[in-house]
Amino acid sequence: NTRVIFCLRGMKTSFNTPHRNMVDFAHVPVIKRMTRMPVCIDPSHSVGTRAISSDGIPDIFHATAQGLVAGANMVLVDFHPNPAEALVDGPQALTLDELPLFLEDVELIRETYLKRQQNFKAVTKFHA
């Protein structure tokens, strides 16, 4: 069915920290290979917070990059004009002011993925 999308959102664990749900975006290429379905990643749901990494980049941006560089077809991210007033998922929502930076970062990661793809198409010694 071409109208079905597989979405990686993570699963609840007893650890519950540092992120809301455990997810391994290394599964993106595996799921694409096994199911032939488009794969969506949901870094908002898996990270669950607006935490900032020690390098100054929000964890949600890092998780997005991990999924996209692994070949995800799409991203599901929570945005809200005022996350503190959101009825659900406010703690993980990015603001609308952060959308341009998010899109710029997504474009950068997508370009990196496409370049990686070209590099491996040029190499003939990698075979399953």
Per-region residue spans from a language model:
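General N-terminal targeting signals
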Residues: 21-23, 56-57, 92-94, 111, ...
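Flexible, glycine/charged-enriched surface loops at secondary-structure junctions
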Residues: 3, 74-78, 113-124
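Flexible glycine/acidic-rich beta-alpha junction loops that bind and position SAM and/or redox cofactors
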Residues: 14-16, 51, 81-90, 119-127
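C-terminal helical cap(s) of enzyme catalytic domains, especially alpha/beta-barrels
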Residues: 82-115
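Catalytic alpha/beta core domains of metabolic enzymes, predominantly
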Residues: 1-79
